[in-house]
Structure formats: structure tokens, C-alpha cells
């Protein structure tokens, strides 16, 4: 299974802002497009880690079934 997410970059007076359309909270900025791209990769990882931590806290002690999902890089 492949899941494709969309990165959006916009030129602003300070450089670039970027976000992922399908992943709320994954947004960043950079002085250059390359910096914004790199920062967005880090932001994606941080959002996923934070969501995992929140989920683990919410289901702690609950009877749940966890199944892994593998997303292929585009």
C-alpha cells in the first residue's frame, strides 16, 4: 500500500513556509526552499511521534488491538 501526502510550500517575504495538507500540525518555515523542505521532514517526524505518545497515553490500560501499517515513501 502506498499513501501519498502533499507538501505545500509558499514563498513569503521571510523565505518559505511549508505544510502537509493531510497531516495537521506538520508545518514549518525556512529562509530557503531547501531549508523549508528539510524542516518539514523533521516536523512530520515530530507530529507522528507526538501523535503516537498521545495515543499510547489514551489507550493505556485499555483492551485494544494494535496493528502496524507500513507507508511506502513516494
Language-model features: locations:
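Short, charged, surface-exposed hinge/linker loops at domain edges
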Residues: 1-6, 34, 38-74
Amino acid at each position: 500500500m502506498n499513501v501519498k501526502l502533499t507538501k505545500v510550500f509558499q514563498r513569503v517575504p521571510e523565505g518559505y513556509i511549508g505544510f502537509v495538507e493531510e497531516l495537521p500540525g506538520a508545518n514549518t518555515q525556512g529562509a530557503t526552499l531547501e531549508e523549508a523542505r528539510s524542516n518539514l521532514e523533521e516536523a512530520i517526524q515530530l507530529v507522528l511521534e507526538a501523535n503516537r505518545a498521545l495515543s499510547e497515553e489514551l489507550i493505556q490500560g485499555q483492551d485494544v488491538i494494535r496493528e502496524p501499517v507500513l507507508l511506502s515513501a513516494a
